[in-house]
């Protein structure tokens, strides 16, 4: 009887621990944006968002890593160039945070991007979408605060 009680308790504890761990972290931890021309793409994202990239090679693919700090919320990722990476407007949509939607859209448009969905005020903030220099659809978000 005691062993079956402990077995049940252990299973329950394992489930609670797993649930707690899953609730303490965001489900998405990393992203990669496909690029054709790494220099053009890093110049675009550096200009539009004022990002500084660290570059590296991972599994024979060129990567330009977006800035990341453990102290801030959110995830990070990379611009990725390689045979397996194909830019698209039809796939996953990544939202970048911005403090000034109008300026970010202006910079995207004047640096080779195209506005796909104009600034729109929805119930949680401002959103917009643009095509980057590589042909990817990228979204913007600005909070109402």
Show where each model-derived region lies.
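Vicinal oxygen chelate
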Residues: 6-26, 30-33, 54-57, 105-145
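Core segments of cupin and vicinal oxygen chelate
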Residues: 22-28, 32-74, 110
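C-terminal motif of bacterial Sec signal peptides marking the signal peptidase cleavage site
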Residues: 2-4
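Short beta-strand micro-motifs in enzyme catalytic cores
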Residues: 62-64, 92, 126-128
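Mid-chain, well-packed structural core segment of small domains
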Residues: 87-108
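Active-site/binding-pocket entry motifs
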Residues: 72, 85-86
């Amino acid at each position: 009887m005691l062993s079956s009680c402990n077995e049940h308790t252990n299973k329950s504890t394992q489930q609670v621990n797993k649930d707690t761990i899953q609730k303490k972290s965001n489900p998405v931890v990393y992203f990669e944006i496909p690029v054709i021309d790494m220099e053009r793409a890093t110049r675009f994202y550096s200009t539009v968002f004022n990002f500084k990239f660290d570059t590296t090679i991972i599994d024979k693919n060129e990567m330009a890593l977006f800035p990341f700090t453990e102290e801030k919320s959110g995830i990070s990722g990379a611009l990725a160039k390689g045979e397996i990476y194909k830019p698209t407007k039809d796939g996953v949509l990544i939202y970048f945070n911005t403090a000034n939607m109008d300026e970010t859209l202006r910079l995207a448009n004047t640096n080779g991007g195209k506005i796909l969905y104009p600034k729109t005020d929805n119930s949680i903030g401002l959103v917009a979408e643009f095509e980057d220099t590589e042909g990817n659809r990228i979204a913007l978000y600005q909070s109402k605060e």
